[in-house]
Structures are given as C-alpha cells and as structure tokens.
Amino acid sequence: MLKDQLEPLLLKVQKPIRYVGGEFNSVVKDKKNIRTRMALCFPDNYEIGMSHLGLKILYSLINAREDCWAERVYAPWPDMEALMRENHIPLYGLESLDPLREFDFLGFSLQYELSYTNILNMLDLAGIDPLAENRTNDDPVIFAGGPCAMNAEPLCDFFDCFQLGEGEEIMLEFTDLYRKAKREGWSKQEFLIAAAQIEGMYVPSLYEVKYHEDGTIESVMPTH
C-alpha cells in the first residue's frame, strides 16, 4: 500500500500534514459501494488549494451521492515531489491514498495561468501521459474548469474536455452520463462525443482550430 511507502518519507519533508488527509469533515467511503471516483485536483500547494471555496462546493456536491466519491489532490512541495520520484510513489488522492491512475475522472481547477506547468507536472507524477492523444480507454477522463477554462486553447492538447461556466451546474449531468457510459461499455471517445452535447462542455478533439500568423484564432470548425 502507498501508506506503508509514504510513512518513512513524511519525517523528511516540511509540513507532512499536507500529504496524509484525515482532516475534520473529509469524506472516506467504502470503495465496494462506489461506481464513480473523481479526483478534484488543485494545481498548487495544500495551503492554497484547501481553502478554495469552489473545490469545497464540488467536493460536497459529488460526495452527497452515495455511489460517487470525490477526493482531493494538491501539488506536492518540491521536497516531497523529489522523494516521491526517488521512491517511485505516484501522485494519489488524499482520502484513499490510491494512485490517480485508478480514478475515473481527474478534474483540475484552472484559477491562474501560472499554475499550468504544475498541471503537467502533476500528471507526470501520477504516471499519466500529459498529451490527451496518447491516452487510452484505460486512463482517467481528464477535464478542467474554473475561470481560465474560458480560454481553453492553450491547454487543449492536455485535456479531454473543459467545463465552461458554473461547475456545480454541469458536474452531476457529467457524472450521470459517465455512469451510463460505464454501464453500457462505451469507449472514451463515445463518452466524449456524448459529453459534448451537455451545455457548457467543450471537447477539443471534436474541433479543428486554425490560427493567424500572429497566434490569434482564425476559425474553430467541428470535425464530428
């Protein structure tokens, strides 16, 4: 278990409490009763991410469903990241300590552009290919929301889809669709095509974007 691998490392880092979970009001569920697992990822350190109200709202909303489990993930500080890489420990959810590869969804909060490199680093630390085109049906669906999702194109190569607007209005419909896809054995592409019909959902792989020489967008054309 990751817990056994983590414990010796916690004595070597600043603020080990960042990496163990167990806070008051954190939600731990029995995995046997869970159909959909989601990691809510904040691409900054624990102190910044844990106080973010939007993350708390989505965490509460998803965990209100008995068969869904949302966990939290934050970017580790460089001292912990170095030890995780040295000891081959993948990035994990705080509640279960399970690797992110085992989740159905990874949802990233895009609050400011300076966090974008942290997103790629977190995916790499999780052992997940950052490029969407290289991922398979066995990888989690990786999506993003938040204020910077309104300018999605700089990150379109890395995400399967973007939630534009208020996440709590889209999230439950999104998870309901995934449960149907899982039950009926859809491929990831089939799920994304259906997800694109949800108002506020943008799936970059279903569009061709052309640019002017100065880097501004010339046109956005659907490919499906």
Name each model-derived stretch:
Residues N25-V28, L58-Y59, E95:
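Short secondary-structure capping/turn segments at boundaries of alpha-helices and beta-strands
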Residues L9-A39, Y46-E47, K210-H224:
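N-terminal [4Fe-4S]-dependent radical SAM core
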Residues M1-K15, R65:
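Helix-enriched interaction subdomains in cytosolic or periplasmic regions
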Residues M38, F42-P43, G49-L61, D67-M84, ...:
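Low-complexity, highly charged intrinsically disordered N-terminal segments
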Residues A75-P222:
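Glycine-rich beta-alpha loop elements in corrinoid/cobalamin-binding modules
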Residues K31-N33, N63-E66, A194-A196:
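A generic structural signal for short, non-catalytic loop/turn and secondary-structure boundary residues
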Residues M50-D67, E168, E199-K210:
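Internal hydrophobic scaffold segments of catalytic domains
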